[in-house]
Amino acid sequence: MEIPEVLETLLAGKDLSPSAMRETMRKIMSGGATPAQIGAFLIALRCKGETVEEVAAAAQVLREMATKVPVSAPHLLDTCGTGGDASKTFNISTTAAFVVAAAGGRVAKHGSRSVSGRSGSADVLEAAGINIELTPDQVKTCIETLGVGFLFAQRHHGAMKYAIGPRRELGVRTLFNLLGPLTNPAGAPNQLVGVYTDPWVEGLARVLQQLGSSHVLVVHAEDGLDEISIAAPTHVAELKNGLITNYYVRPEQFGFRRAALSELAIDTVAASLKMMRGVLDNVPGPARDIVALNAGAAIYAADLTDSLEAGIRRAEAVIADGSARAKLEALAALSRQFAAS
């Protein structure tokens, strides 16, 4: 199916078959579509509304074309979210990755520079002294040695270069926001995924179900946050043993006091790093609480505990004893060794 035919199909409000979506994505990712065609495709698809089947098919293509990280670790976890929630909070899921590693997990943290926020995961990790420009084998060594490694999306998804310009110029959320958490180059089967809109909470869980994921928590809070919120109830769709369960969690269930999201807001990468370090230094407050909530959910998703509450308590313990902070410093040191070699 040629791109104009794809556009006509979408403009008529019709869904693409999985095979048509895969064919279209392969054209886009191999330079077979013009920037105008890519932009038109993304907007037409969003206006029609992406289906679970379309998103799963697109993710399959990006997974095929990614530069893989050859990690063989059971329960390998990612904490990459869709972004695009416009909350301007510090890097919560990135901070949580070090907490999960300290709790005994293996984390393949997939991320990039900021698109819609003020500090992307790559931005804050680089500011923390971590070398983000590692080879797949070097990332593998970090994960196997320390329990955590950073997979810089731009290095692993080279084919995305064709969509970067149109995506940036459009300046609105598109299919690619949904694809970020679905295309981990290490193939992490366990995930905590934040999503920018409530209808995609169960939708993304269904996509990951189709893609064969093992244990996943997809979350979106009523205040709009693409994390488990300290300020409002959070919708969770949990994929486990092939089944999806929907429920809500509230911070007070786990002994946390609600706090305004404004207390977690940052306007620079440096401010995000300061807040991250404060959490890992066990400074009390809403930043530490929201990381404990989300890291606890990730620990549970990584099958390190048998309940969300037990995961949260484990997260609090490894923050308090300094082992989570030690993981951040160890990754900075090891990644810089690679840069020097």
UniProtKB/Swiss-Prot annotation:
Q: So where does Mg(2+) 2 get bound?
A: D226, E227
Q: Where is the signal peptide?
A: none
Q: What is its EC number?
A: 2.4.2.18
What terms describe the molecular function in GO for this protein?
anthranilate phosphoribosyltransferase activity; magnesium ion binding
Indicate which residues the UniProt annotation says bind 5-phospho-alpha-D-ribose 1-diphosphate: 81, 84-85, 89, 91-94, 109-117, 121
Q: Print the keywords alphabetically.
A: Amino-acid biosynthesis, Aromatic amino acid biosynthesis, Glycosyltransferase, Magnesium, Metal-binding, Transferase, Tryptophan biosynthesis
Biological process terms from the Gene Ontology for this record are:
L-tryptophan biosynthetic process
Question: What GO terms fall under cellular component here?
Answer: cytosol
Cofactor info, note text: Binds 2 magnesium ions per monomer.
> Pathway it acts in?
Amino-acid biosynthesis; L-tryptophan biosynthesis; L-tryptophan from chorismate: step 2/5
Q: Which reaction does it catalyse?
A: N-(5-phospho-beta-D-ribosyl)anthranilate + diphosphate = 5-phospho-alpha-D-ribose 1-diphosphate + anthranilate
Q: What are the binding positions for anthranilate 2 in this chain?
A: R167
Cofactor dependence is on: Mg(2+)
Sites binding anthranilate 1 sit at G81
Share what the entry says about its subunit structure, partners included: Homodimer.
Task: Name the family.
Answer: Belongs to the anthranilate phosphoribosyltransferase family.
Record function comment:
Catalyzes the transfer of the phosphoribosyl group of 5-phosphorylribose-1-pyrophosphate (PRPP) to anthranilate to yield N-(5'-phosphoribosyl)-anthranilate (PRA).
Designated name of the protein: Anthranilate phosphoribosyltransferase
The gene behind this protein is: trpD
